[in-house]
Amino acid sequence: MPKYRSATTTHGRNMAGARALWRATGMTDADFGKPIIAVVNSFTQFVPGHVHLRDLGKLVAEQIEAAGGVAKEFNTIAVDDGIAMGHGGMLYSLPSRELIADSVEYMVNAHCADAMVCISNCDKITPGMLMASLRLNIPVIFVSGGPMEAGKTKLSDKIIKLDLVDAMIQGADPKVSDEQSNQVERSACPTCGSCSGMFTANSMNCLTEALGLSQPGNGSLLATHADRKELFLNAGKRIVELTKRYYEQDDASALPRNIASKAAFENAMTLDIAMGGSTNTVLHLLAAAQEAEIDFTMSDIDKLSRKVPQLCKVAPSTQKYHMEDVHRAGGVLGILGELDRAGLLNRDVKNVLGLTLPQTLEQYDVMVTQDDAVKKMFRAGPAGIRTTQAFSQDCRWDTLDDDRAEGCIRSLEHAYSKDGGLAVLYGNFAENGCIVKTAGVDDSILKFTGPAKVYESQDEAVDAILGGKVVEGDVVVIRYEGPKGGPGMQEMLYPTTFLKSMGLGKACALITDGRFSGGTSGLSIGHVSPEAASGGNIAIIEDGDMIAIDIPNRGIQLQLSDAEIAARREAQEARGDKAWTPKDRERQVSFALRAYASLATSADKGAVRDKSKLGG
């Protein structure tokens, strides 16, 4: 029978000092036999996805206390990728994931907490907390802040839906008037919550649901809706049950590694492919799997991508649907239900509610459930009122979207495409793979060949695009922006956005060892591995080299002979200590980022730290 970890600091005469300090936090004698549960919050006023979380930790804590636990809250950092985008701040985004994971480990292990409730929401916060949870392997429940309502405005006498990416595109489009650009900017992000499309934050919150670590509805229920409060209340109650099951009944099924098994990871990736999620999710799932000591690799993702169809299409791949529409169609479990009927899921998995996948679908899949309360929950909709308050409205759609032929979520028979929304490509400068969000690629450019225009920084590429130096048919190559080379693996949302602004969104390709925002669409290929700074062949590409992209056949090729590639690699090595570094780039890199770069692996490993360098 496992002992409560917290007993280390609450029992025994030699722990008198620790107990004295616990008493100073408000604990009493009656608390010293109870489980201590960490409420891991991520409130910040910097990030709209987290601005409403201040009081939600207290909400969870009250339920923990009422259920017989002791709640202790702490906060992590949270970087807003949208605000950090397009300048040096983006160098810090991905490294913040490791800091978040480490800070959770530090706090939980230093104070011997028994379990956790993780209150996350945005891009690197959910992955960081997920990595920590699987590293620590103590009972955990995730409950996120929820998606933002889609923006809406009237243009040309028509009400249209908007999101952050629309504001960026129109802001850079010289054909758009200042008045219209300002109107879109003011309308794009109307409420608190994670940005309203299937960007990285919402993708990851959907995946925690598929992994079984969060409750039904977590990925899609709006931040502003009153129904979301129940997820927080239930999380506080349920975590105490899970904790007691493990420590008092020796039931290891309550542990995250037994819930988020390899089968669950495969289900999560299957969901991601089917819903056309952010390419960043690949990076984060690979990293989380390593923390869980699960053998889940790019090869597994490649196999899944070849058999899973696209059953859901959401912004940025279309402006017709946002997360509020996904929720109306049944949310994550609506998509999982269709995948299950198609025979594409592992059914022998459980979630934090203790339900198997078939049991969960029977209760929560809107296409089969008989539970009116569940149907009501999935009719929760937007209010269209600007606010930063959680649970501030109770609007509902009159009906569910259960049209699986032409609705937001489709059945296998009516799939958006037989190929899923993500694909892994391999070739002679991506030997370990690269990722493309096929959901956002126009059918006309699934096969594309063109001359390379090579840039050694995102800034240089942006200047070239806006300066008219990139033309129709070009393949823009941005290198030395990987985890090690950046360092920090910047998101390339600005280059892809500006290609659209210049009318080149369907006329050019962009390839990088960096990564893309969940808001990216178009022929944007990232995570090229090995990266340039690790000796990858992306470093030897020159202007004018022809590059062939073949998404249907999962190929990407630099059209050079093996002999020429070998000669260029030899020339690169001849640069000595300057080999595999950018030639002309000037970039100030802080000590903190240099420390990150010294251990960073390429994207095919999830950009995690190389344990072998630490003797681990």
UniProtKB/Swiss-Prot annotation:
Keyword Iron-sulfur: yes
Names of the cofactor(s): [2Fe-2S] cluster; Mg(2+)
Keywords: 2Fe-2S, Amino-acid biosynthesis, Branched-chain amino acid biosynthesis, Iron, Iron-sulfur, Lyase, Magnesium, Metal-binding
Metabolic or biological pathway, per its Swiss-Prot or TrEMBL entry: Amino-acid biosynthesis; L-isoleucine biosynthesis; L-isoleucine from 2-oxobutanoate: step 3/4; Amino-acid biosynthesis; L-valine biosynthesis; L-valine from pyruvate: step 3/4
Catalysis performed (reactions): (2R)-2,3-dihydroxy-3-methylbutanoate = 3-methyl-2-oxobutanoate + H2O; (2R,3R)-2,3-dihydroxy-3-methylpentanoate = (S)-3-methyl-2-oxopentanoate + H2O
Active-site residue numbers: S517
Entries under PROSITE patterns matching the protein: ILVD_EDD_1, ILVD_EDD_2
Enzyme Commission number(s): 4.2.1.9
Pfam families: ILV_EDD_C, ILVD_EDD_N
Residues engaged in binding Mg(2+): D81, D123, K124, E491
GO BP term, pick one: L-valine biosynthetic process
Positions of post-translational N6-carboxylysine modification: K124
UniProt keyword Cytoplasm present: no
Binding-site residues for [2Fe-2S] cluster, renumbered to this chain: C122, C195
InterPro entries: Dihydro-acid_dehy_C, DihydroxyA_deHydtase, DiOHA_6PGluconate_deHydtase_CS, ILV_EDD_C, ILV_EDD_N, IlvD/EDD_N
Cofactor: binding details: Binds 1 [2Fe-2S] cluster per subunit. This cluster acts as a Lewis acid cofactor.
Subunit structure: Homodimer.
Record family assignment: Belongs to the IlvD/Edd family.
PANTHER family per record: D-XYLONATE DEHYDRATASE, D-XYLONATE DEHYDRATASE YAGF-RELATED
Role noted for this protein: Functions in the biosynthesis of branched-chain amino acids. Catalyzes the dehydration of (2R,3R)-2,3-dihydroxy-3-methylpentanoate (2,3-dihydroxy-3-methylvalerate) into 2-oxo-3-methylpentanoate (2-oxo-3-methylvalerate) and of (2R)-2,3-dihydroxy-3-methylbutanoate (2,3-dihydroxyisovalerate) into 2-oxo-3-methylbutanoate (2-oxoisovalerate), the penultimate precursor to L-isoleucine and L-valine, respectively.
The protein, known as: Dihydroxy-acid dehydratase
Species this chain originates from: Klebsiella pneumoniae (strain 342)
